[in-house]
Structure formats: structure tokens, C-alpha cells
Amino acid sequence: MGIKPSYIKNLGEELIVKHRDRFSGDFEENKHAVAEVAVIDSKTVRNRVAGYISRKINTRKR
């Protein structure tokens, strides 16, 4: 999908630090968790942040 914008990375990293136990490697679960812990009006931005978090967690597991 290409390089993520810095605001997606910054928000994703911040959410991982603050709410590490709420996120997993599953995108669908992360979508709901991001919606609960952050106020993001745009569905597109929410999904991109959830995808970034999922990818970060999955690469850390390897």
C-alpha cells in the first residue's frame, strides 16, 4: 500500500504505547479498539491507523 503518512505513524505509535494490551495482530479487532480509544471522525483514517498497528504488531512477533 505504500509508505504511510507521518500522522498515521505518529498516531499509531502513540496508541500502541498507551493502549498496548488492547491491540492484537488482527485488523478487525484493531478497528474496533481504535474507534474506542481515539476520536477519529474519518473511517478511512481509522482503518489506516488500525492497519498500521496490525502490521507493527505482526512484524514484532516475528
UniProtKB/Swiss-Prot annotation:
Gene3D superfamilies: Ribosomal protein S17e-like (1.10.60.20). One of its GO terms (cellular component) is ribonucleoprotein complex. HAMAP family: Ribosomal_eS17. Belongs to the eukaryotic ribosomal protein eS17 family. Keywords: Ribonucleoprotein, Ribosomal protein. Coiled coil: none annotated. It comes from Methanoculleus marisnigri (strain ATCC 35101 / DSM 1498 / JR1). InterPro entries: Ribosomal_eS17, Ribosomal_eS17_sf. GO terms for molecular function: structural constituent of ribosome. GO terms for biological process: translation. This is Small ribosomal subunit protein eS17. Disulfide bonds: none annotated.
